[in-house]
Amino acid sequence: AVLGCYLNLANPDEGQLAKITHRYLAHIRFASLLGVGVVGTETGAVNEAYKFEEKNHSDEALDIFIQNVKPVISYAEKMGVIFAIEPVWKHIVCNPKRARKVLDEIASPNLQIIFDPVNLLDISNYQNRDVIIEEAIELLGDDIAMVHMKDFVVQDGKLVSVAAGTGEMNYEKIIRFIKERKPYIHVTLENTTPENAVQSK
């Protein structure tokens, strides 16, 4: 099971950041007490609103996130909990290479990855999705703790998330990765409703 705590570890306000860090530590503590193996999160933005801006993709933003996540990982190690980050194109850890850098700099077995292929995509790169997915599997595969499955369609010049199997995604590489390298991994279906549940299987 995964306990989600999707807050902004790059919040520039020191007071808010302290509260956010405390919330993460509390989630890790409760995860340990409840027998939840993973606390999951995304990687934030350089503004208080947690919105996309180009600075999110800067080296400075990545350094800020790495420094701010270190005490969280240290506590996860003490509590025996996996802390898994989910790369998202709009956020600081926006691609597989940046995720790999975080893993290498932290160098902790308690820091792992939630792999959501659609979250790595944007209107600017979705046509290269097969290459992006291959890169993610190559760079991050050993450290993936969970997979999120959904799909996307293009509407009004933007990607819109939809239930798995109802959009433009090709799952062949993802399914092969799961079968060959992570046969017992947990996979969750996102954007799934009673109306599309059968189709999403």
Predicted segments — roles?
Residues 167, 172-174, 179-181, 185-189:
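H/E-rich (His + Asp/Glu) clusters that bind or coordinate divalent metals
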Residues 188-199:
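A short, acidic, flexible beta-alpha connecting loop/helix-capping segment that sits on the rim
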Residues 9-113:
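Active-site acidic/histidine proton-transfer and metal-coordination neighborhood
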Residues 1-3, 39, 147, 187:
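Hydrophobic residues within beta-strands of alpha/beta enzymes
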Residues 12-18, 51-54, 124-128, 160-163, ...:
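Short, solvent-exposed loop/turn segments at secondary-structure boundaries
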Residues 31, 36, 144, 183-184:
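A structural motif
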Residues 3, 66-168:
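Acidic/histidine-rich catalytic cores of soluble enzymes
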Residues 43, 151, 191:
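Short secondary-structure boundary segments
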